[in-house]
């Protein structure tokens, strides 16, 4: 078992009807997820709507969830930024608050070259030398790809222990696995690609679908690791319509709508992300019903 486990849930950030943080629902949801297949809770990532949260809101959420789940699950903070100084400050704060690690997204908008990316992540790692860090490559959102050779260099830094790979490029994931030591963990950043990534040496997934099917995802990853690929394939194909429905429009709009259909008062997304339109809600209803999740 890797440090962060097999199933990491990129948790939504619950809001009230007025758009304020809903810490009581966050607490209840975190406990529910920890009890239903989640090894590590990732807070304030893409799914957690980090672009529309203040750092103070994030720090308070870190504390609430850390206290709520106690030892039930690890808690990871999304502390990445396109400002290295800002990322260092946030990552140091997450470490001080007793979290188990941090997720660091590739700097967005300013599009640094590979050497700049290396220096950015190295500087953050050196600022928290005993704090486990996971890189996060999602070029579709950041505008820049973290190349396999750069990942390999970063994997030589002791506390950079994993990567969330959301490029959708199986060749690149294969190359990362080839160039990095076995103890460096690769996680799929896309639920629908988890099984293909496992086939080239990934450890698991940073998941959105695990809000709804965490235990099934655990079963899929465990089956593959235990030499039962057919069982893993059956689960993968069963869950594929759900994975697609959850990304029918910009994440996390669909997963918040799905949770609301299940009775979770997670609120809507903050602007500029709108509420889920009726066709998306109907698609989610049909998909959840087919899986007996409603």
Curated annotation (Swiss-Prot):
GO biological process: diaminopimelate biosynthetic process; lysine biosynthetic process via diaminopimelate
Binding site for pyruvate: 47, 206
Entry-linked SMART domains: DHDPS
Keywords: Amino-acid biosynthesis, Cytoplasm, Diaminopimelate biosynthesis, Lyase, Lysine biosynthesis, Schiff base
Subcellular localization: Cytoplasm
Residues the record marks as site: Part of a proton relay during catalysis: 46, 109
Keyword hit for Amino-acid biosynthesis: yes
The protein's name in its UniProt record: 4-hydroxy-tetrahydrodipicolinate synthase
Natural source organism: Acaryochloris marina (strain MBIC 11017)
């Amino acid at each position: 078992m890797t440090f962060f486990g097999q199933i990491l849930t990129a948790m939504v950030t619950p809001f009230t009807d007025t758009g304020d943080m809903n810490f009581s629902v966050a607490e209840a949801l975190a406990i529910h997820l920890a009890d239903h297949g989640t090894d590590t809770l990732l807070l304030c990532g893409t799914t957690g709507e980090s672009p529309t949260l203040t750092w103070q809101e994030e720090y308070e959420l870190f504390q609430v969830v850390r206290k709520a789940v106690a030892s039930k699950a690890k808690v990871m903070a999304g502390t990445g930024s396109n400002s290295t100084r800002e990322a260092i400050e946030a990552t140091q704060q997450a470490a001080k608050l007793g979290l188990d690690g941090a997720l660091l997204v590739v700097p967005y908008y300013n599009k640094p070259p590979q050497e700049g990316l290396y220096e950015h992540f190295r500087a953050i790692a050196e600022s928290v030398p005993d704090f486990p860090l996971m890189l996060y490559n999602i070029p579709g959102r950041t505008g820049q790809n973290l190349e396999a050779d750069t990942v390999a260099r970063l994997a030589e830094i002791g506390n950079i222990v994993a990567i969330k790979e959301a490029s959708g490029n199986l060749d690149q994931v294969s190359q990362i696995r080839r160039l990095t030591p076995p103890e460096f963990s690769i996680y799929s950043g896309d639920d629908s690609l988890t099984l293909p990534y496992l086939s080239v040496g990934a450890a698991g997934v940073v998941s959105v679908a695990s809000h709804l099917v965490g235990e099934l995802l655990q079963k899929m990853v465990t089956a593959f690791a235990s030499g039962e690929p057919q069982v893993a394939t059956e689960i993968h194909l069963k869950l594929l319509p759900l994975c697609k429905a959850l990304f029918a429009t910009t994440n996390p709009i669909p997963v918040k709508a799905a949770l609301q259909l299940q009775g979770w008062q997670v609120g809507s997304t903050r602007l500029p992300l709108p509420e889920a339109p009726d066709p998306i809600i109907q698609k989610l209803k049909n998909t959840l019903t087919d899986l007996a999740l409603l």
